[in-house]
Swiss-Prot record:
Gene disruption: observed consequences: Mice show impaired exercise capacity. Skeletal muscles display changes in the force response and fatigue, characterized by a significantly increased maximal force of the muscle and an altered fiber type composition with an increase in the ratio of type IIb (low oxidative capacity) to type IIa (high oxidative capacity) fibers.
Keywords of this entry: Calcium, Disulfide bond, Membrane, Metal-binding, Mitochondrion, Mitochondrion inner membrane, Repeat, Transit peptide
Name of the protein in question: Calcium uptake protein 3, mitochondrial
Species of the source: Mus musculus (Mouse)
UniProt keyword Plastid, yes or no: no
Task performed by this protein: Tissue-specific calcium sensor of the mitochondrial calcium uniporter (MCU) channel, which specifically regulates MCU channel activity in the central nervous system and skeletal muscle. Senses calcium level via its EF-hand domains: compared to MICU1 and MICU2, MICU3 has a higher affinity for calcium. MICU1 and MICU3 form a disulfide-linked heterodimer that stimulates and inhibits MCU activity, depending on the concentration of calcium. At low calcium levels, MICU1 occludes the pore of the MCU channel, preventing mitochondrial calcium uptake.
Molecular function GO labels: calcium channel regulator activity; calcium ion binding; calcium ion sensor activity; protein heterodimerization activity
Assembly: Heterodimer; disulfide-linked; heterodimerizes with MICU1. Heterodimerizes with isoform 3 of MICU1 (MICU1.1) in skeletal muscle. Component of the uniplex complex, composed of MCU, EMRE/SMDT1, MICU1 and MICU3 in a 4:4:1:1 stoichiometry.
Gene: Micu3
Lineage start: Eukaryota, Metazoa, Chordata, Craniata, Vertebrata
Boundaries of every EF-hand domain copy: 226-261, 395-430, 464-499
């Protein structure tokens, strides 16, 4: 390093006045005779020989300094690269291994050896790929976002749930953090009671809570249903008709949701489905479903149909008899503690139930709105179009975005109240579709005034003129200032369900590999 400094910043030379006998140096530092104005005589032959020797010595010294400087510079560059990028020869899998061996917080476990961690991760990844082959789209999505595992069962945190309904996929590959029963109980002790609920419940809890798979299905149902249906849902929970819902009644209806979602098993996959049920429900549930007709065929109903139809009351008979067994098998979760207290003895009334459902819808909408508002009170009309088209199957969204960009000359913005009222309208989309179909049957498209009137008749909501005009500018592709069923209803049905109807995993290669492995094993 000293040689490098001497090369880059050479020490100052003495002036001619202080060194009259020194030969004058050229701009490159070589001897070039006596300096002008210096006293002395011209060089003799002997002096010329001495000058040649001095010049040769100078050259050797300069080359030595250059060599040392180059070596020092190369070493410095190598050190910087190593610090920034690490060892380029290292195996990437070995570099990633330490991240997978971190023990759960609060537990004094020894670090897992790297070799064992690599083997465990590879085995778990293969099992995950195999189980995805037998899972439904909702099961795959739950397992994709779940981040906690307790005694073999997977759970989402409140933060995981928010991500699952507001993003397409996790930003990073999730690893399941293992919790003991004691750690889970300690986490649930921070859950607030239902009367302290708010529209920021999930954001406040963040990762200090757990949501089971059946609760995930229940919460998805809440997000897409109108306020008028909340009473129907509560009455279906209230099996004894006392206007209160206890923990057993809540778990019985969750069991209905689970059985409705179970995928019909094919020959040869019993073991894989059993492993999948253990991950999703925490126990090996029986495969026979009460949601069957006399002919043994699965009833084709939505979750809301299960809640809405009075004939569904008969479905509780089989499950109500073994409600105690279900209660003993199901682990406590944030939702159960929030509704029924830490001891599970509290009961839930309709007002608290309604407030929870309304707060959940509001919280998810607030998160989506704030992600585009950048701290402002409004979002642009183009951002509103982005949100509406986000979970749809529309391939070329640029056409709709250009409609807004060029049709609305002056940007006024969409407020949160307008934003929320529109999504409340979407939750009533089925009733609105009936009214809109009546116009289509008459071979008519619908204008803005007719649209507002149909929305009010079907849902009781009054949409602002600016909001209605923005919707028409987005979906009026043929520029006739009219709206048809094809232009609007079909796209909005996809948006209402946030892509869950047609959700497909993006991991195409692992799925293909699992399918190929299954085919080879069957031969």
């Amino acid at each position: 390093m000293a040689a490098l400094r001497r090369f880059l910043w050479p020490p100052p030379r003495l002036s001619p006045a202080l060194a009259p006998q020194q030969p004058f140096l050229s701009p490159w530092g070589r001897p070039a005779g006596t300096a002008p104005g210096m006293s002395g005589r011209p060089f003799s032959c002997r002096e010329e020989d001495e000058g040649a020797v001095a010049e040769a010595a100078w050259r050797r010294r300069r080359w030595g300094e250059l060599s040392i400087a180059a070596a020092a510079g190369g070493g410095l560059v190598g050190l910087v690269c190593y610090q920034l990028y690490g060892d380029p020869r290292a195996d990437p899998s070995e570099l990633a291994a330490p991240e997978l061996e971190d023990p759960p917080r609060g537990r004094g476990l020894l670090p897992i050896p790297v070799a064992a961690a690599k083997e465990t991760v590879a085995t778990g990844r293969a099992i995950t790929e195999d189980l995805d082959l037998y899972a439904t789209s909702r099961e795959r999505r739950f397992r994709l976002f779940a981040s906690i595992e307790c005694e073999g069962q997977l759970f989402m945190t409140p933060y995981d749930f928010i991500l699952a309904v507001t993003t397409d996929e996790p930003k990073f590959a999730k690893t399941w953090k293992s919790l003991s029963k004691q750690e889970l109980s300690q986490m649930l002790s921070e859950t607030p009671p239902v009367w302290k609920g708010s529209s920021k419940l999930f954001r406040n809890l963040k990762e200090r809570g757990v949501i089971s798979y059946t609760e995930y299905l229940f919460l998805l149902c809440i997000l897409t249903k109108p306020h008028a249906g909340f009473r129907i849902a509560f009455n279906m929970f209230d099996t004894d008709g006392n206007e209160m819902v206890d923990k057993k009644e809540f778990l019985v209806l969750q069991e209905i949701f689970r059985k409705k979602n179970e995928k019909r098993e094919t020959k040869g996959d019993e073991e894989k489905r059993a492993m999948l049920r253990l991950q999703l429900y925490g126990y090996h549930s029986p495969t026979n479903s009460v949601l069957k007709t006399d002919a043994g065929e699965l009833v084709s109903r939505s979750y809301w149909d299960t809640l809405r139809r009075s004939t569904s009351q008969a479905l509780f008979s089989d499950l109500a008899e073994r409600a105690d067994d279900i209660t003993s098998l199901v682990a406590d979760t944030t939702l159960l503690v929030h509704f029924f207290g830490k001891k599970g003895k509290a009961e839930l009334n309709f007002e608290d139930f309604y407030r929870f459902m309304d707060n959940l819808q509001t919280e998810v909408l607030e998160i989506e709105f704030l992600s585009y508002s950048n701290g402002m009170n409004t979002i642009s009309e183009e951002d509103f179009a982005h949100i509406l088209l986000r979970y749809t199957n529309v391939e070329n969204t640029s056409v709709f975005l250009e409609n807004v960009r060029y049709s609305i000359s002056e940007e006024k913005g969409i407020t949160f109240d307008e934003f929320r009222s529109f999504f409340q309208f979407l939750n009533n989309l089925e009733d609105f579709a009936i009214a809109l179909n009546m116009y289509n049957f008459a071979s008519r498209s619908i204008g803005q005034d007719e649209f507002k009137r149909a929305v009010y008749v079907a849902t009781g909501l009054k949409l602002s003129p600016h909001l209605v005009n923005t919707v028409f500018k987005i979906f009026d592709v043929d520029k006739d200032d009219q709206l048809s069923y094809k232009e609007f209803i079909g796209i909005m049905k996809d948006r209402l369900h946030r892509g869950f109807r047609g959700y497909k995993t993006v991991q195409k290669y692992p799925t293909f590999k699992s399918c190929l492995k299954k085919e080879l094993h069957s031969r």
